Design a protein with these regions (language model features):
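Catalytic machinery of carbohydrate-active enzymes
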Residues: 1-347
Length: 347
C-alpha cells in the first residue's frame, strides 16, 4: 500500500501558458490527495500568477541561472516531500525532482533531455495529438485521480485584485460594466505575431463600427509591439501594455468581453477565466496548444507546411499561414463571438 501523500511538489517553472495548462492537473491532484500540502516550483517572473491559483499552499520561486536553481535545493530537501510531479519534462526540472530527496517522482516517459531518467514512475503519452491540458492530466490519472469531465481552472478571487482592475480601467477611460475588447499583439516567437498593421486595422474597425474600446495588454517586454500598433491606429488607443502585473491578468481578462490575440500566454488565461477568444495561429498547432474549451475561434491560413513549429520562415511569402488572415476576418469573428456570448458586450 502506498504511503499517504501529505507534502506534494509540483514542478512547472514556465511559461505563462504552460502554467495555466497545468491548473486542471493541480485541481485533480488536490481531489486525489485532499490532505496534501502543495508546493509549486516556478520561475520567479511567473510566481505572482501561481500565487493566485487556487489550491497552491506554497510558491517556491527560482531565479534564472544554475545558481538560482541549485540555491533552492536545500529548501526542497528540508520540506520532506512525499511525491514530486514534474510536468516540465526537461533536464533541469527532472534533476530538481531528484535533488529534492523525494523517493517518489513521476513524469512523462517521453520527457526531453533525458529527464525521465530521474523519475521513479513514467507516464506513457499516446501518439495521437492531444491538448497540453489533457496530456498533463494523464499524470494525475496515473496517480489514481479521476479524470474530470470538465477540467477546472480556478483562480483565487481577491477583492483587492478586482478593485485594482477597476481602478486601472477607469483611469484608462473604461467605465464600470462597459464592454470592451482586449487585444494582445505580442508573442514570444516572431513567427507567431500577426502583423501590427492588421491589428491596427482590426482595432479601428471595431472602435468605429461598434464603439467598443479596444484595450492593448501585455508585459513590459511587449511595449514595442504595442507601440507599433497604436502608431498605425486612426482611432483612440487604450494601451495598458506594461501596466498590468501578471497576477492581475486573470482579473483583467475576466473583465474583458473578448480577447483578440496571437498564440500566447494571455490567450490561455482568457480561456481559463471563461472569456471568449479569437486567436491568430501560424506555425503552431491549436490542437495541442489552442485556447482550451468551447466558445473560442482560431483563425489561420492553410498552407501545406503548417504547423511547422519553426521560429523562422523560408516561404516565398513569409509567414503566409498567419499574414494571409485579413483584419475583416478577425472583425467578423469578434462580432459573431460577441453576439453569442453570455458575457457583457454582446452586440
Amino acid at each position: 500500500m502506498t504511503d499517504p501523500v501529505r507534502r506534494l511538489l509540483l514542478i512547472k517553472p514556465s511559461s505563462l501558458g504552460d502554467i495555466v495548462h497545468a491548473m486542471p492537473t493541480l485541481a485533480a491532484l488536490r481531489e486525489r490527495f485532499p490532505q496534501a500540502r502543495v508546493t509549486w516550483l516556478v520561475k520567479r517572473q511567473w510566481a505572482p500568477l501561481v500565487e493566485v491559483i487556487a489550491g497552491v499552499d506554497q510558491v517556491c520561486s527560482v531565479s534564472e541561472g544554475l545558481r538560482g536553481w541549485l540555491g533552492r535545493v536545500p529548501d526542497l530537501r528540508a520540506a520532506g516531500f512525499d511525491l514530486v510531479v514534474d510536468l516540465q519534462g526537461l533536464f533541469r526540472s527532472g534533476a530538481m525532482a531528484r535533488l529534492s530527496g523525494c523517493d517518489r517522482r513521476i513524469g512523462f516517459a517521453n520527457a526531453r533531455e533525458g529527464s525521465s531518467l530521474f523519475y521513479t514512475q513514467r507516464v506513457a503519452v499516446p501518439p495521437a495529438p492531444m491538448h497540453a491540458v489533457d496530456r498533463y492530466l494523464l499524470v494525475a490519472e496515473a496517480l489514481g485521480a479521476t479524470r474530470p469531465t470538465q477540467p477546472r481552472f480556478e483562480f483565487v478571487d481577491r477583492a483587492e485584485d478586482r478593485q485594482a482592475v477597476e481602478t486601472m480601467l477607469s483611469r484608462a477611460g473604461v467605465a464600470p460594466h462597459q464592454p470592451w475588447v482586449a487585444m494582445n499583439v505580442s508573442a514570444r516567437w516572431e513567427t507567431k505575431r500577426w502583423p501590427p498593421q492588421h491589428f491596427a486595422e482590426a482595432a479601428d474597425r471595431l472602435s468605429q463600427a461598434h464603439a467598443l474600446p479596444v484595450v492593448l495588454i501585455g508585459g513590459p517586454a511587449e511595449r514595442a509591439e504595442s507601440l507599433a500598433v497604436t502608431a498605425l491606429m486612426r482611432t483612440k488607443a487604450i494601451d495598458l501594455t506594461g501596466q498590468t502585473p501578471v497576477g492581475l491578468l486573470p482579473g483583467l481578462l475576466r473583465r474583458a468581453s473578448l480577447l483578440v490575440t496571437n498564440d500566447s500566454g494571455p490567450m490561455h488565461i482568457a480561456a481559463a477565466v471563461g472569456t471568449p477568444v479569437v486567436a491568430l495561429f501560424g506555425p503552431t498547432d491549436p490542437v495541442k496548444t489552442g485556447p482550451y474549451g468551447k466558445g473560442h475561434v482560431v483563425l489561420s491560413h492553410a498552407v501545406e507546411c503548417r504547423p511547422c513549429f519553426r521560429r523562422d520562415c523560408a516561404r516565398a511569402v513569409p509567414l503566409e499561414c498567419l499574414t494571409a488572415v485579413r483584419p475583416e476576418q478577425v472583425v467578423r469573428a469578434v462580432e459573431q463571438q460577441l453576439e453569442r456570448s453570455q458575457k457583457p458586450g454582446s452586440l
